[in-house]
């Protein structure tokens, strides 16, 4: 299994997240790696917390479901993760406009 130490890239990740926020964009939490033994969705909880603490609000959830059986795979994990990071909602897009759904 592959692991990485995101702390090695902390400064760069912070710059990227600030840029995303300044441009009114968001990030996605993706659960696909959980199918292959990763310990948590990507990005990890610490990066999601950093995004929140920097003022990030738009956050979507994906699973890379290339098969029906993986549609919304382990989204239960993400709900808890978002709450632990300080979020009260996640984001969906309707006609390219963000809508915030309470957790």
List PLM regions with ranges.
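Active-site-proximal loop/short-helix segments
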Residues: 1
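Charged catalytic cores and adjacent phosphate/nucleic-acid-binding surfaces used
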Residues: 4-103
């Amino acid at each position: 299994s592959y692991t990485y130490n995101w702390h090695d890239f902390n400064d760069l990740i912070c710059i990227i997240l600030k840029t995303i926020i300044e441009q009114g964009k968001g990030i996605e939490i993706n659960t696909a790696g959980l199918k292959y033994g990763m310990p948590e969705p990507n990005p990890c909880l610490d990066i999601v917390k950093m995004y929140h603490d920097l003022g990030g609000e738009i956050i979507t959830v994906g699973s890379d479901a290339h098969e029906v059986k993986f549609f919304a795979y382990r989204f239960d994990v993400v709900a808890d993760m978002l709450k632990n990071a300080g979020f009260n909602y996640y984001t969906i897009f309707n006609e390219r406009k963000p809508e915030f759904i309470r957790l």
